[in-house]
């Protein structure tokens, strides 16, 4: 397929976006943002209601996707229109001490934040009875409907792509009076389930017990040790026997030591190294080194350059797990106080565990799935007001692999995408107050 013709609508959207910005209204000052257009909730000044602050928001965006189902042949493209609304409710911010020269911010004894949107809901609660102890409780629900397989490959059946994820967590936090030392221990329960019956074999729950200890030294540096134990169970074992891929209950451990801080006024980094292991009821186990290096340079207050490397081992529906080695770079610019532009690029070298079907036969033409995944994008946002923004993004995503699935028949596979390329473009307007 020729991707040049697919890219034309994306370039047209980007050109229109840039042209509009050049003749835009007088700007409002843009706040700092991360590396990418976040089309989720954004917070403005809010409406005060007693001790609570209400933050409503609404976003309208249109986009083009050259490969909706991430297929390697006979791609399906589409224009997409999305309307998203949300409402956040929060207690007021931290209170400042009126006495002393430090004027440090002190958290309120009770802090609350909650929100509800079309595909996202959250509740965050913190109880701070003293400066040295806190209790934090939170629950987050996310729902995605992004297609991950072509319904025409399953006997023409139409079904929902809805994937629901809920995470409930509790943390106990203790710290020294000087706040040099801080320790955390907690528990979380994650539940992941699909709408469609054909994907019910992938439903699972994960119990986690995280713990961490941080030591702050110098004004802007910290050493952090973290440990996590996770136990994952698939809730429909009988359906796994009839599914196309082998899924296994497992226990996972990971431990790491990292440094985070600013070395100079312009240069900062996060560096860490650790160990991860996974023990599965069936097929491959894993153990190995995990690492992270994230460098950040700000040659000017309006320019931020980031580059880094990640080595991680993550759960996967194929082969139990995937070992990932990823390189990435981002650049963010603020122009005229209101226009934010950014670039992002990444490449990841991934390898799965032994990819098997439930009957023990190979899932594909090779024992292990190996991929090179590439991503790139250009994005921007223009603030007309402190609560009104125009945003746009053009992106590229690709997966290169020699792995091919064998003998799947009509059985639908979770996330089968392999050997694809996709261009997409988005343009939208959002109000957040």
Where are these regions (language model features)?
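N-terminal secretory signal peptides that target proteins for export/translocation
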Residues: 1-10
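Residue-level detector of alpha-helical transmembrane segments in integral membrane proteins
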Residues: 2, 19-20, 49
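Gram-negative and organellar
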Residues: 32-433
């Amino acid at each position: 397929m020729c991707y040049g013709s697919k890219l034309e609508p994306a370039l047209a959207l980007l050109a229109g976006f840039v042209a509009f910005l050049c003749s835009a209204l007088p700007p409002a000052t843009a706040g700092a943002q991360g590396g990418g257009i976040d089309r989720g909730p954004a917070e403005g000044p809010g409406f005060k209601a007693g001790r609570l602050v209400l933050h409503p928001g609404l976003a309208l965006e249109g986009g083009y996707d050259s490969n909706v189902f991430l297929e390697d042949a006979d791609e399906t493209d589409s224009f997409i229109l999305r309307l998203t609304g949300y409402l956040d409710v929060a207690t007021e911010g931290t209170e400042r001490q009126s006495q002393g020269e430090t004027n440090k911010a002190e958290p309120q004894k009770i802090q609350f934040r909650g929100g509800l949107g079309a595909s996202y809901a959250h509740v965050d609660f913190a109880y701070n009875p003293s400066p040295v102890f806190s209790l934090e409780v939170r629950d987050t629900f996310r729902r995605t409907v992004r297609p991950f397989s072509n319904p025409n490959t399953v006997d023409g059946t139409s079904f929902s792509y809805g994937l629901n994820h809920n995470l409930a967590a509790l943390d106990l936090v203790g710290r020294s009076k000087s706040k040099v030392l801080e320790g955390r221990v907690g528990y979380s329960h994650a539940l992941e389930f699909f709408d469609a019956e054909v994907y019910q074999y992938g439903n699972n729950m994960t119990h986690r017990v995280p713990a961490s200890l941080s030591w702050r030294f110098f004004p802007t540096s910290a050493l952090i040790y973290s440990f996590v134990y996770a136990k994952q169970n698939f809730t429909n074992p009988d359906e796994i026997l009839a599914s196309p891929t082998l899924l296994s209950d497992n226990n996972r451990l990971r431990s790491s030591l990292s440094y985070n801080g600013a070395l100079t006024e312009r240069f900062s980094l996060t560096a860490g190294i650790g160990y991860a292991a996974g023990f599965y009821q069936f097929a491959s186990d894993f153990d190995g080194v995990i690492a992270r290096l994230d460098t950040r340079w700000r040659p000017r207050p309006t320019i931020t350059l980031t580059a880094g490397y990640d080595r991680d081992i993550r759960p996967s529906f194929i082969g139990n797990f995937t070992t990932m080695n990823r390189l990435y770079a981002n650049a963010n610019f603020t122009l005229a106080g209101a226009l934010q532009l950014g670039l992002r690029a990444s490449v990841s070298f991934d390898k799965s565990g032994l990819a098997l079907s439930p009957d023990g036969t190979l899932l594909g033409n090779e024992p292990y799935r190996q991929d090179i995944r590439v991503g790139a994008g250009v994005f921007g946002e223009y603030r007309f007001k402190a609560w009104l923004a125009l945003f746009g993004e053009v992106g590229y995503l690709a997966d290169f692999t020699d792995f091919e699935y064998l003998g799947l028949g009509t059985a639908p596979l979770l996330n089968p995408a392999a050997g694809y390329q996709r261009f997409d473009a988005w343009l939208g307007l959002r109000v957040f107050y």
